[in-house]
């Protein structure tokens, strides 16, 4: 019997990418589906959604409306992920042609969902931490691995605890076996995923070996033929000295750290319920620079959070100047349902929010120009992962710079030393040496 066709669109973060891989694995290996990039020939159309900001939620309904217009007769549409979790039955009301809704904490139910009319699985307390998913990966050379699900932080602006539930760690033996299996199949790099990865080990479903995130990194680095370990996202509150020292000293841990700042104002951080101050954040970031001079630090910043004054915004700019981030993901505050910040007084007007975002981004562009210029004539070890137009190939350095050289398919999955000849903001161009 010929395979049915599956089309999947993934919005949002790396955790959504891994969730999509899990659903693809379940459907291709258990339900006789094969992936297609042509939505018109698909028997099943999935969209895996994000709800961190308002814009992706609006995008969901425009996308599924488009799916309905082009899908073939009898094809099913499923809405999955975080927006599915928080909108639930509202999706059926607004888009009655959707066949099932599957929340971010319920993706193991995908084979049940496709067989049940108007199936809705949105239980954020459902525990998938020990579910044995079938195996599928978009990349041979890099493997995403979940180490926890959910989040306990309840930051006042964030909807994630309402869509992914409380935090629970995945047992070490499951993580280790998954990493080992990925390496045996050709992975050179593993990418550990969780809302707060460095809070790992605080709570498991059952009794398991006591282990924190630093211990996990050390244990995984013993896997033979594993070259690199990356992770996202750590929480600044849990960046103790042990963690920073393991990060700096373990040669398999990539020297790229995502440190979500959100705001440089201690008052705004308190209102956000982030659990740390500006001083704590700077202490950790600057200690990291001291321990690991070649580290690249990226961050998330929200401008115009309710009550943010010009002085508060200047505190954020001050952290930008002191840390000099290699990369920032910056946004205007987006009011999200179910969050405390949505009903806070002193919401900031659009004009002020746009001005602050432009000021932040423009200054960071200047800093980034200075940073990338210093990379010229340096030599980096690069893992090549992606073919590009014009007989070019791209990969990443240990500290996460994107590098492009002339090259072809045989370089995929290989490490090569590359000398940088021309450094741009988004790409470092170089030559293999």
From Swiss-Prot:
Pfam family, one: TRAM
Subunit structure: Monomer.
Cofactor(s) needed: [4Fe-4S] cluster
General function of this protein: Catalyzes the methylthiolation of N6-(dimethylallyl)adenosine (i(6)A), leading to the formation of 2-methylthio-N6-(dimethylallyl)adenosine (ms(2)i(6)A) at position 37 in tRNAs that read codons beginning with uridine.
Transmembrane segments: none
Reactions mediated catalytically: N(6)-dimethylallyladenosine(37) in tRNA + (sulfur carrier)-SH + AH2 + 2 S-adenosyl-L-methionine = 2-methylsulfanyl-N(6)-dimethylallyladenosine(37) in tRNA + (sulfur carrier)-H + 5'-deoxyadenosine + L-methionine + A + S-adenosyl-L-homocysteine + 2 H(+)
Name used for this protein in its record: tRNA-2-methylthio-N(6)-dimethylallyladenosine synthase
Gene: miaB
Lineage: Bacteria, Pseudomonadati, Campylobacterota, Epsilonproteobacteria, Campylobacterales
Keywords: 4Fe-4S, Cytoplasm, Iron, Iron-sulfur, Metal-binding, S-adenosyl-L-methionine, Transferase, tRNA processing
């Amino acid at each position: 019997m010929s395979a049915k066709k599956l089309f999947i669109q993934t919005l949002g973060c790396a955790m959504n990418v891994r969730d999509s891989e899990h659903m693809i694995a379940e459907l291709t290996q258990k339900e006789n589906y094969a992936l297609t990039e042509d939505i018109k020939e698909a028997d099943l159309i999935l969209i895996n959604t994000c709800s961190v900001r308002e814009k992706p939620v609006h995008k969901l309904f425009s996308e599924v409306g488009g799916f309905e217009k082009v899908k073939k007769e009898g094809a099913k549409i499923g809405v999955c992920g975080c927006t599915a979790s928080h909108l639930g039955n509202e999706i059926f009301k607004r888009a009655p042609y959707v066949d099932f809704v599957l929340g971010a904490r319920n993706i193991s139910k995908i084979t049940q969902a496709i067989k049940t009319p108007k199936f809705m699985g949105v239980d954020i307390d459902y525990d998938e931490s020990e579910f044995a998913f079938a195996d599928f990966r978009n990349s041979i050379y890099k493997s995403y691995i979940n180490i926890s699900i959910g989040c306990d932080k309840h930051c006042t602006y964030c909807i994630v605890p309402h869509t992914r539930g409380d935090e629970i760690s995945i047992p070490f033996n499951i993580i280790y076996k998954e990493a080992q299996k990925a390496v045996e199949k050709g992975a050179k790099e593993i990418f550990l995923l969780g809302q707060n990865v460095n809070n790992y080990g605080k709570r498991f479903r059952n009794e398991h070996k006591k282990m924190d995130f630093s211990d996990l990194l050390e244990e995984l680095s013993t896997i033979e033929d594993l070259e690199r370990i990356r992770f996202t996202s750590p929480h600044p509150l849990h960046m103790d000295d042990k963690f920073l020292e393991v990060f700096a000293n373990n040669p398999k841990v990539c020297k790229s750290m995502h440190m979500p700042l959100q705001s440089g104002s201690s008052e705004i951080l308190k209102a956000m319920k982030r659990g740390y101050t500006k001083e704590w954040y700077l202490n950790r970031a600057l200690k990291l620079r001291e321990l690991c001079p070649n580290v690249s630090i990226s961050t998330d910043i929200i401008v115009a959070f309710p009550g943010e004054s010009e002085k508060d915004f200047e505190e954020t700019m001050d952290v930008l100047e002191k840390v000099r981030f290699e990369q920032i993901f910056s946004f205007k505050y987006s009011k999200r349902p179910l969050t405390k910040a949505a009903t806070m007084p002193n919401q900031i007007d659009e004009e002020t929010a746009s001005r602050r975002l432009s000021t932040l981004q423009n200054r960071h562009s200047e800093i980034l120009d200075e940073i990338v210029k210093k990379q010229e004539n340096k030599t980096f070890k690069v893992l090549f992962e992606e073919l590009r137009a014009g007989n070019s190939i791209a990969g990443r350095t240990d500290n996460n710079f994107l590098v492009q050289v002339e090259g072809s398919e045989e370089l995929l999955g290989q490490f090569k030393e590359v000398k940088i000849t021309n450094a741009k903001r988004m790409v470092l161009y170089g030559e293999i040496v």
